[in-house]
């Protein structure tokens, strides 16, 4: 179990992406682990409408922090989010709470996703989206 003292957690809020970023001295600590240990509290969005949720997710998919993840998630959001119900949108929202590099490695298969993401339909759809577009040059979709 990690504590605040042991990981020397430092966070900042990125105005560009609206996503919390973390640095730590622990060997490998994901955003999910920080949430599980209640080291951080997510923003309460319980009263958010479906339309607002969908719009926020499209925006957050475009403005991540690293270009590779921006390109993958923005195209994925344009193609898939309109088909998702509220439950899947919330699952995608939870995925966006993960670090950019983790999402990139998990969806490309470079690293194994944590156990709680292994049966995720969203992550499975994201992997399918990437594999079906092999050799395609990606551009940021229009807003």
From Swiss-Prot:
HAMAP family: SDHAF2 (MF_03057). Its main location: mitochondrion. This is Succinate dehydrogenase assembly factor 2, mitochondrial. It comes from the Eukaryota. Belongs to the SDHAF2 family. GO terms for cellular component: mitochondrial matrix; mitochondrion. Keywords: Chaperone, Mitochondrion. GO terms for biological process: mitochondrial electron transport, succinate to ubiquinone; mitochondrial respiratory chain complex II assembly; protein-FAD linkage; tricarboxylic acid cycle. Plays an essential role in the assembly of succinate dehydrogenase (SDH), an enzyme complex (also referred to as respiratory complex II) that is a component of both the tricarboxylic acid (TCA) cycle and the mitochondrial electron transport chain, and which couples the oxidation of succinate to fumarate with the reduction of ubiquinone (coenzyme Q) to ubiquinol. Required for flavinylation (covalent attachment of FAD) of the flavoprotein subunit of the SDH catalytic dimer. Pfam families: Sdh5 (PF03937). Interacts with the flavoprotein subunit within the SDH catalytic dimer. It is found in: Mitochondrion matrix. This protein may be expected to contain an N-terminal transit peptide but none has been predicted.
């Amino acid at each position: 179990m990690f504590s605040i003292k042991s990981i020397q957690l430092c966070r900042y809020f990125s105005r560009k992406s609206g996503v919390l970023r973390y640095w730590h001295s622990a060997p490998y600590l994901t955003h999910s682990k920080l949430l599980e240990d209640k080291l951080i509290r997510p923003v309460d969005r319980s009263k958010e409408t479906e339309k607002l949720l969908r719009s926020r997710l499209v925006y957050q998919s475009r403005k991540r922090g690293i270009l590779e993840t921006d390109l993958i998630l923005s195209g994925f959001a344009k193609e898939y989010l309109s088909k998702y119900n509220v439950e899947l949108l919330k699952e995608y929202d939870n995925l966006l709470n993960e670090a950019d590099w983790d999402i990139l490695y998990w969806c490309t298969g470079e690293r194994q996703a944590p156990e709680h993401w292994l049966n995720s339909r969203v992550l499975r759809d994201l992997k399918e989206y990437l594999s079906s577009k092999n050799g395609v040059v990606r551009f940021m979709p229009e807003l």
